[in-house]
Amino acid sequence: MIEVPYATVAQRLMAGIIDLMIISVISMPIFIFTAKYSLFVQFSLATSSAVVLMTLYYSLTEGALSTSPGKKMMNLYILDSDSFRPISYRQALVRNIIRMADASLLYLPMVLNKDRRRIGDGAAGTIVVSKRRLSVRVISPEEYKKRKMVEGGAYSMDLAVAEALIDKIKEKASTFPAEKLENTIKYIERGIKIDEIKRRSMETIGSDDPCSILAFSVLAGYIPARSILSQQDFVDILEKASLFAFSQEERRSLSIKAGVLRGIDEAERYTKPFRLNILLRSMWDSPRLFREITPFFLASFFILLFSAFFAMWMPSDIVSQLKELMGKENISMPGPFVTAIMIILNNIKVWLLLYGGGPLIIASPSVTAINGVILGSVGGLLMREGRALDFLSAVLPHGVMEVTAILIASSIGIKMGLSLIFPGEKSRYESLKEVAMRYSDLVVLSAVLLFIAGFVEAFITPILMHEHSIAITVSILEIIVLYLFLLKSK
């Protein structure tokens, strides 16, 4: 049976606990900073920053290192499921946004799947492997001789590994300076007489030269292989053993282990820098990707619109409830800058819920409908008070960009849900991965829109609220510029 050294549920749980402890320490200044504000502000900043901070923490650490601090302590690494190479920043981002769906299901997919992949792993095309579970059996010299006689050229996995190990040690030892090789042999002599070693080396390997003695000593356990061989050498051993093994299944198993170890070695030796051109390239590709999801964007728009119209004519006390939550007049309220941060974080949280909830099928349209109900309830209440223009002036300047970003996330979420229902000839994870990875570039565009919308809402909207003609004119210009960019063709 071909076995990939997947991380166990217990290992991933321990790694997650460690990471959550680190995230909690990082987020402590946020709780201290918001203590002077009302409960509404504290709750909004705490929940939004927790979701955003967790997504950033995992995406940046896993993108750069193919592991997180918690996983590193548990010797766990995240690799591409096809190539076994370290993952990209894009894969790290996708697997951690989709964490929303996994958390909603209490991570049951990870527990139930044999490969311990959660939905986020399926969407990003990743696996989590354990370096501790990546091992092969090294047989004793006596067993090596016996198997060599019995198996002939039809090597089993154990014999293939032993043969490749001997060849690699002899090759490595031949490059040692004479003094180093001599000192190593003297170290071995401390535990066993050199004549005995030479005799057994000749019987086992067929030679008693210093390189063969060294290879025999490793096989016999007199010295650890890691004192001579590097991690890359072990990769070479597994690759060579995969050529020696007779069984096709064992060749495949050894090849997989070699690939996994190579990926881990690369992840440990190199840190991927985060380059600005990644963001610029994503922005450049956004219009093309937006045009591809236009039907889903329109569907999300109509869900939002119908929900708003439905709620507009229903009695609602949402505004009064929000005022009550905001606290009494003697409680300190944030200034425009903190308000902008609060709005941006909350909008990003909603965006992540829409995108990350896509695999749950019903989550994205449901969250879109809820936002429509809230918008329609507030709008309907103000319209009944004869303040329709106040409502439009308060919503449109920032709402054009904010709603566009929210609908983009909803569109991708709906498309992901449909990819699971109708996977075609592909597996459901393959179908999900195709959608999630392809449209991940729209994350950058959406983040930019939400940042701009947050600052507009905090700094500009209060100025334009009673300047109806200016607010509506600015909003129309925003629509023209934004959608000319999104719908442009090369």
Task: Go through each PLM region and give its residues.
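Membrane-interfacial and juxtamembrane segments of integral membrane proteins
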Residues: 1-241, 247, 260
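N-terminal signal-anchor transmembrane alpha helix
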Residues: 291-317
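Cytosolic juxtamembrane regions of integral membrane proteins
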Residues: 240-292
